[in-house]
Structures are given as structure tokens and as C-alpha cells.
UniProtKB/Swiss-Prot annotation:
Keywords: Amino-acid biosynthesis, Cobalt, Diaminopimelate biosynthesis, Hydrolase, Lysine biosynthesis, Metal-binding, Zinc
Species this chain originates from: Pasteurella multocida (strain Pm70)
Catalysis: reaction(s): N-succinyl-(2S,6S)-2,6-diaminopimelate + H2O = (2S,6S)-2,6-diaminopimelate + succinate
Known function: Catalyzes the hydrolysis of N-succinyl-L,L-diaminopimelic acid (SDAP), forming succinate and LL-2,6-diaminopimelate (DAP), an intermediate involved in the bacterial biosynthesis of lysine and meso-diaminopimelic acid, an essential component of bacterial cell walls.
Cofactor binding note from Swiss-Prot or TrEMBL: Binds 2 Zn(2+) or Co(2+) ions per subunit.
Protein's name in the database: Succinyl-diaminopimelate desuccinylase
Family: Belongs to the peptidase M20A family. DapE subfamily.
Pathway(s) it belongs to: Amino-acid biosynthesis; L-lysine biosynthesis via DAP pathway; LL-2,6-diaminopimelate from (S)-tetrahydrodipicolinate (succinylase route): step 3/3
Length: 378
């Protein structure tokens, strides 16, 4: 299994699939799966390519989800090796996407291949959902596939998203949820004027100070057993013309909340509106909801994955909901039990992104054993 995973991972890394350009990665995967009897369905939306592949029929539907797109490489002269050369040095595979997430994608594919070869008449459905739009807009990828499946009443019961979840050593963390993410673009209106004549103007920066203080010090909740407290950060702020003698006519503030299951996006919007009204601000606000929080508590998938990882690594992982958003938030909308599990995330999006190939081999073992155990237990 190890050599097959390494070979496929290197083949995928050599394709410069900057989001949302798949660069033929999914075609490589589809051809492999089709030879084993997987049904291949292409679900393209705009410039994004999506693959929905499945083997078997009926329930339970156990899916692996991942993405072929990667982030830009930046200054290539800073890399030890060309970022799309897939160099293997001292058991470490280098390249953009090695950890996020072409390595675990290769492990998924090979694990599914091994399982289907050994169990051609298995019960239930083994599926793979692969997109080329995760790292950028994430508008035409997994979310559109999920919408398509839900519209035709096609379920996913369990799903492992192959994001690099491990922190210090392989298998130490299983992500069983994520916080929600909502961003506000706030425009506070004033009256532009000369700084020497403040009585003829209205400075929106001065007017907003009380509101901004309340906004940044407000305690939304105390978190819970699964999530830390909701947090708010101002990401961007802008006012003025650049001149030192002009009172600005508008203040722009962009802030983001990473919120837990103790609040909702509606509660957040309502509270912010109350604060703005309290401070008597003339404003316009635009909200963008990136994803609602989700949580997969104890269940067959979580229990099975924890047991399998412990058996393979000799260490029991712990559950965690930290970090940013992922495509798991879309799959959770189907009512599926969803977790994220993959290799170390220490080098993702960095120069010299890399992954230990022994970890990839273990990752493939985990995925295959989960299939065996889940389909036997259901």
C-alpha cells in the first residue's frame, strides 16, 4: 500500500493545480477507480471540476472527501526543491499540496482500491467526493455537490474529510467539528471636512470609538465542552484620504467572528445591530456567512476512527474543534457524521510544504480499516 500511495501522491503533486484549476488530477483518480467498478459522475460548476465516485449500493454510504486544488506557491526561489517536482528525500515528500491535501487524497484512493479489491461484494456504498474548489472561493465545489445530492435524495451517512488534522505527531487529533465563521463589512458614515473646522464636519472614526470598544470587549458566550468561546477580531479598518488635513467622510471596518454552538449567526447580527443603534451610528453593513458550526459527537464513525488510529499508532487521539473552516461544514448539512483526519499540518501553505511518507502509509491503513470496521458493524 505504501508504495502505491507515494506513487499516486507524487503524480498528483506534479500537477500545478492552483485553485480552482484541477490540472487533470481528478481524471487520474477517476480512471483508477473506474477500472475497479466505481461509478464515475462528473459534476462541473463554472470553472470548478467535481468528482462523485461510488462503489456498491444502498446504505450505509461511507464517503471520503478531499480536494485537488492547492494554494499558490509564492516565491519559488525560497523552496529547497521546485514546488511541483514532488521530491522524495529521506522519507519526506516535498511539494505544494503534499500535506494539504494530495497526500491524504492518495491515501484515500489507495485505501478504497484495496478495500474494494478484497471485498468486491461489500455491503453499503463506498464513495469519494473530490473537488478543485476548496482553497479559494469554495462556491462551486463541495457545497454544489452536496446541494445536488440532497436535491435528488442521495444521502451520505458517514464521511471522513482528509484535511491534515494531526498537530505534533501523526494521529494525535481527530477533528469532529468546526466553529462557524461570519464576516461583517461595516461602513460608518460621517461628513467629510477640514480638520480646522470640525464643527462643519462629522468624524466617523470618533463617532465609532465607543461602538468598537463595546464590540471588541463583548463576551458572546463561555464556550462549551466541545468548543472554545466565540471570538471576534477586527481584520481591516480604513478611513481618510491620506491627507492630514481632511476629516474622513466614511469609516470602513471589517470584522470576523469564529463562533461556537452557543450562539447563531442571527443572534450575532441582532446583537451587532443593537450596539450600532445604541451608539447612534449612521451605517451600512454587509454580512457574509462562510459556514455554520457543526459537531459530530460520539457515534459509530468517531468511535471507530478513534479505535483504529489507536490500534495503528499505539496512541489514542483526542477530539478537537479548533482551527479554520473546511468543506466538512457543507457535508454536515446532509445530517452525516463527519470528521476530519489526515497527516501533520505543520507545513501547510508554507514554503517547503512536506509530509512524511510513513505517515501517509499509516493514513491509508486507517482509512482502509475504518471501511472494514464500519461496514462490518452496521
Amino acid at each position: 500500500m505504501k508504495n502505491s500511495i507515494i506513487e499516486l501522491a507524487r503524480e498528483l503533486i506534479r500537477r500545478p493545480s492552483i485553485s480552482p484549476d484541477d490540472q487533470g488530477c481528478q481524471q487520474i483518480i477517476a480512471e483508477r477507480l473506474e477500472r475497479l467498478g466505481f461509478q464515475i459522475e462528473w459534476l462541473p460548476f463554472n470553472d470548478t471540476l467535481n468528482l462523485w465516485a461510488k462503489h456498491g449500493s444502498g446504505s450505509p454510504v461511507i464517503a471520503f472527501a478531499g480536494h485537488t486544488d492547492v494554494v499558490p506557491v509564492g516565491d519559488t526561489t525560497q523552496w529547497q526543491y521546485p514546488p511541483f517536482s514532488a521530491q522524495l528525500v529521506d522519507n519526506v515528500l516535498y511539494g505544494r499540496g503534499a500535506a494539504d491535501m494530495k497526500g491524504s487524497l492518495a491515501a484515500m484512493v489507495v485505501a478504497a482500491e484495496h478495500y474494494v479489491k478484497a471485498n468486491p461484494e461489500h455491503s453499503g456504498t463506498v464513495a469519494l467526493l473530490i473537488t478543485s474548489d476548496e482553497e479559494a472561493a469554495a462556491k462551486d465545489g463541495t457545497v454544489r455537490v452536496v446541494e445536488t445530492l440532497m436535491a435528488r435524495g442521495e444521502p451520505i451517512d458517514y464521511c471522513i474529510v482528509g484535511e491534515p488534522s494531526s498537530a505534533q505527531q501523526f494521529g494525535d487529533i481527530v477533528k469532529n467539528g468546526r466553529r462557524g465563521s461570519i464576516t461583517a463589512n461595516l461602513y460608518i458614515q460621517g461628513i467629510q471636512g477640514h480638520v480646522a473646522y470640525p464643527h462643519l464636519a462629522q468624524n466617523p472614526v470618533h463617532k465609532a470609538l465607543g461602538f468598537l470598544t463595546e464590540l471588541t470587549t463583548y463576551q458572546w458566550d463561555n464556550g462549551n465542552d466541545f468548543f472554545p468561546p466565540t471570538s471576534l477580531q477586527i481584520a481591516n479598518i480604513q478611513a481618510g484620504t491620506g491627507s492630514n488635513n481632511v476629516i474622513p467622510g466614511e469609516l470602513y471596518v471589517q470584522f470576523n467572528l469564529r463562533y461556537c454552538t452557543e450562539v447563531t449567526d442571527d443572534i450575532i447580527k441582532k446583537k451587532v445591530a443593537e450596539m450600532l443603534a445604541k451608539h447612534q451610528l449612521n451605517y451600512r453593513i454587509e454580512w457574509h456567512l462562510s459556514g455554520k458550526p457543526f459537531l459530530t459527537a460520539k457515534g459509530k464513525l468517531v468511535d471507530t476512527l478513534l479505535d483504529v488510529v489507536e490500534k495503528i499508532t499505539q496512541n489514542r487521539p483526542h477530539l478537537d474543534t479548533g482551527g479554520g473552516t473546511s468543506d466538512a461544514r457543507f457535508i454536515a448539512l446532509m445530517g452525516a457524521e463527519v470528521v476530519e483526519f489526515g497527516p501533520l499540518n505543520k507545513t501547510i501553505h508554507k514554503v517547503d510544504e512536506c509530509v512524511n511518507v510513513d505517515d501517509l502509509a499509516k493514513c491509508g491503513e486507517v482509512y482502509q480499516h475504518v471501511l472494514c470496521n464500519m461496514l462490518e458493524r452496521v
